[in-house]
Regions:
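Mid-domain alpha/beta scaffold segments of enzyme catalytic cores
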Residues: 1-246
């Protein structure tokens, strides 16, 4: 079954040629994640033309500036975004210096609070440490693609929004997020077509993008004993609330 754009949402998609084309033609409520000043500018142009596109940006633990750089270009670009992120801590998928990660994470959390921006979090392998840091920086948080078997309830106790990606049926950690997150804090994300391909091991086409959002919703619906349309409506409403929490 197909669904109208007005029911669809994607809490986290990276800027790409496909994302730019799709969002120029569709009213899917979306947060476009950017990691460079150039991406921020492009995403801002998309957002200017589509009231359902919002921009996130920040210094990702995978892409820390050189120690003597200061990250000034990206810091200036962050002033253009609606939501800060994705930012966080990662000792699994990258070898960035952990002390530098901690510094940038804490500094950006403070900036988000001072500027009134909600935050998208990338946490991998450092869930417990990140949790302790977040407890000292109260804000509105979206934990993107949480894949740790532990600490989920602790993040939920902080009031975090949690997103379900591709797919609960193939990842027990994603299924746990779908099952245990309160309905009013549940979001849907793809992380982009390339991430869907990586997660599924399939050559997913760009034409499959809307169906991917619906499939995630359908799997949540089965877990929560709801209809797919109910889940699509709820997660879109939740994303709108998260975006406008600043």
């Amino acid at each position: 079954m197909t669904y109208d754009d007005s029911l669809l949402s994607d809490a986290h998609i990276h800027l790409s040629d496909f994302a730019a084309r799709f969002l120029a033609a569709h009213d899917v409520l979306t947060i476009v994640s950017t990691a460079t000043p150039e991406e921020c500018k492009t995403a801002r142009q998309l957002a200017a033309a589509n009231p359902y596109v919002f921009v996130s940006g920040g210094i990702h633990p995978w892409h820390l500036p050189p120690k003597n750089d200061g990250g000034f270009e990206m810091i200036n670009a962050i002033n253009m975004v609606d939501i800060l992120g994705e930012i966080g801590l990662d000792n699994v998928w990258c070898d960035s210096d952990l002390d530098e990660q901690r510094k940038w994470f804490s500094d950006q959390l403070k900036f988000a609070i001072n500027s009134g921006r909600p935050v998208v979090l990338h946490i991998k392998g450092m869930e417990q440490e990140a949790l302790e840091i977040l407890r000292h920086h109260p804000n509105t948080y979206h934990v993107h693609w949480y894949s740790c078997p532990d600490y989920l309830d602790d993040y939920l106790a902080l009031g975090c929004y949690m997103s379900v990606g591709p797919f609960p049926s193939i990842d027990p950690a994603v299924a746990a997020v779908a099952e245990r997150t309160p309905l009013d804090r549940l979001l849907i994300e793809t992380d982009g077509i390339d991430a869907v391909r990586w997660a599924t091991g399939r050559d997913v086409s760009e034409d499959d993008y809307p169906a991917t959002l619906v499939q995630i919703a359908s799997e949540i619906a089965e877990i929560r004993h709801l209809t797919t349309e109910d889940v699509l409506r709820q997660t879109r409403d939740n994303l709108w609330r998260f975006i406008h929490s600043y």
